Amino acid sequence: MPAQTDLASSSGIVLFIRYAFMPNHLGYCGGNENELLLERAATGQADPRLTPLLTQFTGATPYLRSIAAANGVRDPFDRRVVEAYWLGNELLARVEARDLYQMLEERFGAHLPPKLREQVLRKPPEGAKPFHLFHVVDVYRHLERETVGMAAMESCRISWGQVRAVDGASVTVDRQPLVLREGKFALGEAQPERVLRSFDGLGFAEDVSVGDWVSVHWGWACEVLDDRKLANLRRWTAHHLTIANRTI
């Protein structure tokens, strides 16, 4: 029987791939093994031997390591750590501002002009945590050479939608889009949107039903959300939009 740490690592690897697959498939992050990662994760064959492939996601890995270190977790791909990064959970609260500040300065500081560098580095003392949305709205949009528009940030953030129809490889969800309201980030009125739930017959939302809530990343249904995960995602999303709006 695998050790408990191996089980936590394996489930964390699956969870990471659920969210990382589609941007990896689209060529935005990670290496070139997206089909292998999807197959292994969707068929329950993910194990710690896949970790070297996951470390190629160089945007996410520093945040995972920060969360793990702050919580005394050896493996940055532990399920609890991965969940904290993508969806938010209690592990985020234990990350000290000074530690996130140091990580951001070391990893991204040299890639930002002085004014933007100062703007990003002021966010940890204001309450920012190593949460995916923080990277999207307060780091990623400043790192790209070309302007990152609302459409890219909207696709890149982890959102949630309630399933209204299931149709083969796709589901239709009611989902709130990211919008600008009086020059500030906000969530708009829910709108129907069709998202993929499987690719070449493989996916992570096979048992979804009308009325379920799913997380969405780059038009991909990552998983069915229980009440706890949905509440955490909503909470940490609102928190980081508030922080982003201070300097938008």
Residues of each region from the PLM?
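Short peripheral tails and domain-boundary helices/loops at the edges of structured domains
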Residues: 229-248
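Structural detector for short beta-strands of small beta-barrel domains
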Residues: 151-174
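Short, Lys/Arg- and Gly-enriched loop/turn segments at beta-strand edges
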Residues: 219-232
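Beta-strand/loop nucleic-acid-binding surfaces
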Residues: 182-205
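N-terminal intrinsically disordered, low-complexity, charge/repeat-rich segments that act as generic
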Residues: 1-148
